[in-house]
Amino acid sequence: MDSKSLAKSKRAHTLHHSKKSHSVHKPKVPGVSEKNPEKLQGNQTKSPVQSRRVSALPSNWDRYDDELDAAEDSSISLHSDVIVPKSKGADYLHLISEAQAESNSKIENNLDCLSSLDDLLHDEFSRVVGSMISARGEGILSWMEDDNFVVEEDGSGSYQEPGFLSLNLNVLAKTLENVDLHERLYIDPDLLPLPELNTSQTKVSRNEEPSHSHIAQNDPIVVPGESSVREAESLDQVKDILILTDESEKSSAIEADLDLLLNSFSEAHTQPNPVASASGKSSAFETELDSLLKSHSSTEQFNKPGNPSDQKIHMTGFNDVLDDLLESTPVSIIPQSNQTSSKVLDDFDSWLDTI
């Protein structure tokens, strides 16, 4: 139903009710009075005419009552189904300003609530937990031992809030040094090389000895797979040490022989008659050289170094020592020596050349 038809039906309904109210009213019958008898007679003569007119023309408005009620019901149902715009348009600027004002008021209320809560928590936290934080861990130990701990509450102006989560880096570094390396890195000890593991364990043992001197020593913790690795590496180290000791002993023996030769030549220089003792010294020199060559050949047979570069270094050092020894021999002894000494020297030089 259109808005125009709805307006027409409302208008007809109002007119119908106004006419109906007028038609219902009955004409007033003039009262009987003694003062105007003439008017009473005139009215009595006119009243049957009016009653006839009313009876002759009955009202037919009752015929439209049902139709008007049906039209009103249909208009109400259609009006509830169809959304009729209240106005031609809305003021969007006004609506936006109202929404912004509401949002700002909500934000301010939330901020006020949060700030008050933050202030309350901060004050309570600083007063209750402040002394324990300043003690740097002592409060936690007191928790573990006894729950009844004393909190210092001072409301004076000299009260200062301790720094939240304040750390002493020096103390932390010292405590980390007391911990093993694999525990600091959260890895298995088998993954670390042995020297680093040993150094970390020695540091830990050195740091723990003064602090735990009054505690009995506990049994060492054996990690599976670690003992075999340590035993193998310790055996390798022992072998290296034995080889080095053998080489050092043999080198010391060679040096002792060379010292004897040098001492013999120095005694030859100090003697007043070198010509008389030349034959004796040459024979002693031959014997010393023979023993030296035998010892050197035996060391070469039993101890063959793994690297040829090490062998060359030892041989070059030995050759240099012998060259210095030969150069230090006196000139007076060399021409007076026997042919045997010259042959021995030639053989020795040829042997050095072959090396």
UniProtKB/Swiss-Prot annotation:
InterPro entries documented for this protein: Exosome_cofactor/PTGS_suppr
Disruption of the gene: reported phenotype: Shrunken non viable seeds due to arrested embryo development when homozygous. Alteration in cuticular waxes. Decreased production wax with dramatically fewer alkanes.
Basic residues composition bias: residue spans: 7-28
Amino acid composition bias (Polar residues), ranges on this chain: 41-53, 296-310
Annotated stretches, region: Disordered: 1-60, 296-315
Main location: cytoplasm
Record's keyword terms, sorted: Cytoplasm, Endoplasmic reticulum
Entry GO terms, CC: cytosol; endoplasmic reticulum
Tissue specificity of this protein: Expressed in taproots, lateral roots, root tips, leaf veins, cauline leaves, inflorescences, flowers, and siliques.
Compartment(s) where it occurs, according to its Swiss-Prot or TrEMBL record: Cytoplasm, Cytosol; Endoplasmic reticulum
Function: Together with RST1, acts as a cofactor of the cytoplasmic exosome and connects the cytosolic RNA exosome to the SKI complex. Acts as a post-transcriptional gene silencing (PTGS) suppressor. CER16/RIPR can, like RST1 suppress the production of small interfering RNAs (siRNAs) from the CER3 locus, which is involved in cuticule membrane and wax production, and in the typhine and sporopollenin biosynthesis of pollen.
Subunit annotation: Interacts with RST1.
UniProt protein name: Protein ECERIFERUM 16
Organism: Arabidopsis thaliana (Mouse-ear cress)
